Amino acid sequence: MPVLHNRISNDALKAKMLAESEPRTTISFYKYFHIADPKATRDALYQLFTALNVFGRVYLAHEGINAQISVPASNVETFRAQLYAFDPALEGLRLNIALEDDGKSFWVLRMKVRDRIVADGIDDPHFDASNVGEYLQAAEVNAMLDDPDALFIDMRNHYEYEVGHFENALEIPADTFREQLPKAVEMMQAHKDKKIVMYCTGGIRCEKASAWMKHNGFNKVWHIEGGIIEYARKAREQGLPVRFIGKNFVFDERMGERISDEIIAHCHQCGAPCDSHTNCKNDGCHLLFIQCPVCAEKYKGCCSEICCEESALPPEEQRRRRAGRENGNKIFNKSRGRLNTTLGIPDPTE
């Protein structure tokens, strides 16, 4: 019977990936379609992906699939062909290729079955997730940005918006996607006559959000096909002005793709212009925050003097201090003046 999960340590897998000589391509894709047996589908896809040496994070549910992966360059076309042949619903599926890629985005394959591929908190039995808004292509996006009757709604989390967004786009002040959905409806109630344009990193969140807005009585709703990634790629290919400002946050080891030269965020420690996210080097903290090179040297990669001091302690003393304390990654929320606790690199589906 084939092994359908990883049995090698995370450190060993990362070292193995870093030692690889073959380049890799970072790809993301999603598809809303009915999967009758997510567990069986998961096991079959795990074998397919493993055979092609694919790393990454994949979620499956009855509502579809959501994946961010790293594929050896020589296997990309084989992967594409086998994915398209796996299920008729996946034939011709758009694969978003990373805009900036060092091939080091993932080093282990994690594939999980979930209740939803995007945690939306929707329990309305009358909600039709397939009744989505209209797609916008790159040229149409730019035209909408110049339309005074159009409002651009960013359906990403605050730390994503902080480092990059479309010109004049509105931020929905929430920590998770499930919190954003009702807030988006509430914030836009006075603007039902406007054209609502929704976007996210790769399209999965804004597609569902567009359906939710239509479900709540908004009739003029659009969303950007392929999200920021596909927009930037097509705009560059077609010689169009790229109207996204700053960096596109991504949920892997890269933590960002440069879209424009502007740096619109600031170091969370000294306030200098900076849009580089990092995790606090203190194993008892791992706060996700923005840190400039000067502060990185000053605080030795930590988020505070306290964490800097603690990370210098002997390992046993660090473990003693962490005992009984809430650990795991935290996210610095500058707009709210507090921290949010999550597990691992922030999950775009939450």
Swiss-Prot record:
Database matches in SUPFAM superfamilies: Rhodanese/Cell cycle control phosphatase
Domain Rhodanese: start-end pairs: 146-240
InterPro entries assigned: Rhodanese-like_dom, Rhodanese-like_dom_sf, Rhodanese_C, TrhO, TRHO_N
GO biological process, one term: tRNA modification
Active-site positions on this chain: C200 (cysteine persulfide intermediate)
Its biological purpose: Catalyzes oxygen-dependent 5-hydroxyuridine (ho5U) modification at position 34 in tRNAs, the first step in 5-carboxymethoxyuridine (cmo5U) biosynthesis. May be part of an alternate pathway, which is able to bypass cmo5U biogenesis in a subset of tRNAs under aerobic conditions.
Protein name as annotated: tRNA uridine(34) hydroxylase
Organism: Escherichia coli (strain SMS-3-5 / SECEC)
Gene designation: trhO
